[in-house]
């Protein structure tokens, strides 16, 4: 019986992870969120579900994370944002708390305990191998449109790689994402594709976590479609445009709308 911790369970990826994990017989979910009411409104299937335990609280609460991560096979770290927030540090803060929690959990469990794998949701845009086929004119636009988010992810990755002598991390790096149905996916160490549905991304993350051979451990992993691409998200042009404004004119941040791929 596998138990998965989903950190960021109210986000698009997090919600899909919870749904797909619960489709597995006997699988359990530890869902972390900052607002339980928001989570239950978005995912009513978890209400009174004995296979789901919700952990509500601050991203800086180490003891809460210790309880959330205890007994888990894998930790899906999906705490991020679609907005190019100046000075974004959500991923760094999450990783810092996770590492502190796992250090504490390791001490509590002793040498016989097991530490869960971490699957960090990152981006193919910051992987020059996976994104090598991205049009040369478009790549700098994307890097600027989400520059603050990518800088945050880069630091988070560095923090996790610095602990690779005792922590196993899988770096999931999809291309563009879409609110679409699940069509089928493939994991790849060589390619990425846009657009991927959030459901296919979630399924790919679960597959990587469950791989008994550890083929994806400590690697950058792309996701490609197996049965046709996801639809183009109509919110993408606005998301890019507003992201560029936040990149070049960060003082405009509070006056700009929140955007997303929908």
Swiss-Prot record:
Domain of life assignment: Eukaryota
Keywords linked to the UniProt accession: Monooxygenase, Oxidoreductase
Pathway listed: Secondary metabolite biosynthesis
Enzyme Commission number, as recorded: 1.-.-.-
Oxidoreductase found in the keyword field: yes
Expression triggers: The expression of the dibenzodioxocinones biosynthesis cluster is positively regulated by the transcription factor dibT.
GO molecular function ontology, one term from the record: monooxygenase activity
Keyword Protein transport (UniProt): no
Function as written in the Swiss-Prot or TrEMBL entry: Oxidoreductase; part of the gene cluster that mediates the biosynthesis of dibenzodioxocinones such as pestalotiollide B, a novel class of inhibitors against cholesterol ester transfer protein (CEPT). The biosynthesis initiates from condensation of acetate and malonate units catalyzed by the non-reducing PKS pks8/GME11356. Pks8/GME11356 lacks a thioesterase (TE) domain, which is important to the cyclizing of the third ring of atrochrysone carboxylic acid, and the esterase GME11355 might play the role of TE and catalyzes the cyclization reaction of the C ring.
Family: Belongs to the avfA family.
PANTHER family tied to this protein: FLAVIN REDUCTASE-RELATED, OXIDOREDUCTASE MDPK
Name this protein carries in UniProt: Oxidoreductase GME11367
């Amino acid at each position: 019986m596998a138990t998965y911790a989903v950190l960021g369970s109210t986000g698009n990826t997090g919600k899909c992870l919870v749904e797909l994990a619960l489709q597995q017989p006997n699988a359990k979910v530890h869902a972390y969120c900052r607002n339980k009411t928001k989570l239950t409104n978005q995912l009513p299937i978890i209400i009174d579900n004995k296979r789901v335990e919700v952990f509500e609280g601050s991203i800086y609460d180490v003891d809460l994370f210790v309880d959330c991560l205890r007994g888990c096979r894998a930790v899906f770290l999906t705490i991020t944002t679609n907005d190019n927030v100046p000075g974004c540090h959500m991923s760094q803060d999450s990783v810092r708390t996770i590492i502190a929690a796992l250090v504490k959990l390791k001490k509590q469990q002793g040498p016989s305990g097991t530490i869960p794998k971490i699957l960090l949701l990152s981006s193919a845009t910051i992987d020059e191998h996976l994104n090598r086929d991205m049009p040369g004119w478009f790549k700098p636009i994307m890097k600027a449109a989400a520059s603050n988010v990518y800088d945050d992810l880069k630091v988070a990755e560095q923090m996790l790689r610095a602990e690779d002598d005792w922590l196993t991390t899988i770096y999931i790096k999809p291309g563009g994402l879409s609110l679409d149905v699940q069509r089928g996916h493939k994991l790849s160490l060589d390619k990425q594709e846009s657009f991927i549905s959030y459901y296919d991304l979630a399924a790919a993350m679960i597959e990587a976590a469950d791989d008994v051979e550890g083929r994806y451990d400590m690697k950058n992993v792309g996701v490609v479609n197996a049965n046709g691409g996801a639809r183009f998200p109509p919110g993408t042009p606005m998301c890019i445009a507003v992201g560029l404004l936040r990149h070049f004119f960060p003082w405009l941040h509070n006056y700009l709308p929140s955007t997303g791929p929908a």
